[in-house]
Amino acid sequence: TGVPLGTFIGQQTAWHMSFLFIASIGLVGLIASYFLVPKNLPIPGKVDIKGITRIFTNKPLVFSFLITAFGYGGTFAAYTYLSPLLENLGFSANAVVIILVVYGVMVAIGNTVGGHWANKKPLDSLVKMFSLLILSLVFLFITVLMDNSLLGLLASLMLGLFAFMNVPGLQLYVVELAEKYVPEDITLASAFNIAAFNIGITVGSMTGGVVTDHLSVTYTPIFGGFIVLIAVLFVLYIRKQEEQKNNYL
């Protein structure tokens, strides 16, 4: 909800106020952390540089990072350009901001639901959540082609619901793998997964930019869907490898 809220503040006042708002929220977070975070938390040990080698020579962990990058990043091929997509459907700039705020609420709901799903079987849950995300991206693409504002609005909110539903599962899966294969490097593996999230954002946004330059912004959702599909293939591959290993044992 932060991005659309910042956009709304900037449009209603001045763009400088968005940064003041961000700084204010950061200050509140800093003060809250100082008073609310326990002072007696255990201090983690130093990161072992050799852990990098252990992590990146572990096939399941490497694939988990790729799943994170593609599964999370595909959304941004469309989300980065959601405003012009909505404007092309006839929504005003003010209406787009309101839609994005509601989109943010849908993201929060999706995150919560995704966390519950991921608690059981992360890999199976990721396949379902990625599939729903792909369907929402395809639906958005079709509604834009149809130039149907009502369906486009529905598709955008569906995208918000499914876009980041996978985040808890992606992080949980990496932690589970780290506990299994490199228990001494769990913190480092988690950090690399966060890096994979950001790489995914970069790749997805750049893909959307290239598509917009060479084709049209209309096609960004379908290309985002293809990126997420790559993540699904990786998940299916890893799941098959795990099943074969379990059968062998």
Predicted segments, located by residue:
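Helix-loop junctions on the cytosolic side of multi-pass membrane transporters
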Residues: 25, 30-48, 237-248
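A late C-terminal transmembrane helix in Major Facilitator Superfamily
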Residues: 177-216
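Helix-to-loop junctions at the C-terminal end of transmembrane segments
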Residues: 10, 110-123, 212-213
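A membrane-interface helix-boundary motif in multi-pass transporters
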Residues: 11-24, 209-228
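C-terminal transmembrane helical hairpin of 12-TM major facilitator-type secondary transporters
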Residues: 124-170
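Pair of pore-lining "gating" transmembrane helices in MFS-fold secondary transporters
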Residues: 57-77, 157-161
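Intracellular juxtamembrane helix-capping segments at the cytosolic ends
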Residues: 165-181
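Helix-loop-helix hairpin linking two adjacent transmembrane segments in secondary transporters
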Residues: 1-37, 41, 63, 68-71, ...
